[in-house]
Amino acid sequence: SASTQVPLPEGAKVLVYSRGSVPATTLAMMEKGFTTVIAASKTTYTAVAGDQIGVDTVANIVTITLPASPAQGDEVTIMDVSASNGFGTNKCVVARNGSKIRGGTSDLDLDSDNECVTLIFTTADKGWQIKSSNYTI
C-alpha cells in the first residue's frame, strides 16, 4: 500500500475513500480542518467554521480572524502549540471580523502559555461565546 501526499489550499474540502485500512481516529481528525499557523512564516489566518487551529507564536504575534458570516453553532478552536515561549511571550489575537465576542466589540487576546479555547457562535447579540477553555474570565 503506497502513500501519496497532495498539497491542499487552506479551507479545502476533502473526500477520502478508504478500503478500510484508515483508522477511525485518523478520519475523525480529518473531519474538521486542523491547521497549524507558525509565526515564523505566517502571522495571520482567517478561520472557517469547524477549524481546529494550532498556533505557534514563538517568533511573532499571530492574528486569527473569525469567520465573517458565522451561522449559529459554528465553532472554531484555537490552541497554543508552541514548544516554548508561546502565547505568554507573543499573544494570539482573535479578531472578531464584525461579530461580537462575548457580547462585546473588542478582539480577544490569548496571552497565557498553553491556552486553548473553543469559540461557538450563538446569536448576533452575544456573538462568539467561549464554549470550553482554560481561559480565565
Predicted regions mapped to residue ranges:
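Glycine-rich loops and low-complexity Gly/Arg-rich segments
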Residues: 78-80, 103-104, 119-120
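Exposed extracellular interaction/assembly regions and N-terminal maturation sites
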Residues: 1, 22-96, 124-137
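Terminal beta-strand-rich extracellular "head" domains
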Residues: 96-110
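Extracellular disulfide-bonded cysteine-rich modules/repeats
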Residues: 9-20, 112-123
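A short catalytic or substrate-binding loop motif that flags glycine-/basic-rich loops and adjacent residues
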Residues: 70, 110-113
